[in-house]
């Protein structure tokens, strides 16, 4: 490439005073490339790729825009040095001032907010009770006034600076309604206004690494002698209670300490005796010929046990419809009962409302003693 003097050969069209719009007009780019390079030689797409030893290799993509922070060497050595492009056209500033390569920080020019600005936008993941507990827990004397709690929340969480009225009311409500916060009056020699608020010692274990776990109190946590009664988790089905003790006795897994108790309640009867009593009572009602006027007493006697094999004899009067002789319409309606199952009327007459009214489910099916739930 032959050297030339840009001042002697530069036409006035090559350096018009274009406004700084951030990109090169296509007409200007075509004209300058056709003027500076012969048509027979392939012209590069970017002027920063000229193969000259005077240019130092750089990774800045905006070198050809001739920003004010870039001072490229002139084409011809001498005191009268000029830049490759006119200064009026390259008024765009460098977008990536601290950039050493495109791969390092491509988005370095974006306005990234600081941490304080992010905290103003994002709500803290803590409840108001947790904020109060954090403020009191961080105080030297483990007590703070209401105004001091406000100040702690506002200083450490900039999110609450924009709407103070809303969250301050919530702070006051939590102090009044939460049992973990206790009001302590001021001393006589302590000047100031307002009472102190402290954290209940029993609730300190609920404050764990800034997480105020909302958990109901358990009566089994602290026994009368001041020791933990049990280490079983909350809601365990094996907790000590009279009802659960009865179920354990029924399953045969009662604890050894309750075997010698003088007030031990009798275990409820098993399912099989209850079912047998029910079947025997039904057998007695079906086989009885006289009207029933009173309920049969509970108990599985030997007579009813002997009749267990004969309890279904009364149901043998079932007659299939296919074996019945043909009758007329009047004979059929007069001789056959209206029930759809084919049973004789004598069997169904035994199960009258008087039969069900005479049976007491409380004393016939189950024994009332020892089965209270």
UniProtKB/Swiss-Prot annotation:
Any one GO molecular-function label of the UniProt entry: DNA-binding transcription factor activity, RNA polymerase II-specific
SMART domains to which the protein is assigned, alphabetical: FH
Polar residues: bias regions: 238-258
Regions recorded as binding DNA: 123-217
Keywords: Activator, Developmental protein, DNA-binding, Nucleus, Transcription, Transcription regulation
Cellular component GO terms, alphabetical: nucleus
Subcellular compartments: Nucleus
Any one GO biological process: cell differentiation
Main location: nucleus
Tissue expression as described in the entry: Expressed dynamically in a dorsal to ventral wave in the animal cap ectoderm in late blastula and gastrula stages. Expression is present in the cap in a salt and pepper arrangement which is maintained throughout early development. Expressed in lower levels in the mesoderm. At later stages, expression is lost from the developing nervous system, but epidermal expression persists through tailbud stages.
Pfam family, one: Forkhead
Gene induction: Inhibited by nodal signaling downstream of vegt, and by notch signaling downstream of dvr1/vg1. Neurula stage, but not early stage, expression is regulated by canonical wnt signaling.
Gene3D superfamilies: Winged helix-like DNA-binding domain superfamily/Winged helix DNA-binding domain (1.10.10.10)
UniProt cross-references to InterPro entries, sorted A to Z: Fork_head_dom (IPR001766), FOX_domain-containing (IPR050211), TF_fork_head_CS_1 (IPR018122), TF_fork_head_CS_2 (IPR030456), WH-like_DNA-bd_sf (IPR036388), WH_DNA-bd_sf (IPR036390)
Region: Disordered, residue numbers: 1-23, 208-274
Function: Transcriptional activator. Activates ectoderm, in addition to inhibiting mesoderm and endoderm formation; required at the blastula stage for normal formation of both the central nervous system and epidermis, the two early derivatives of the ectoderm. In addition, also required to maintain the regional identity of the animal cells of the blastula, the cells that are precursors of ectodermal structures. Also plays a role in differential adhesion, which limits cell mixing as primary germ layers become specified.
Name of the protein this chain belongs to: Forkhead box protein I1-ema
Organism encoding this protein: Xenopus laevis (African clawed frog)
Lineage: Eukaryota, Metazoa, Chordata, Craniata, Vertebrata
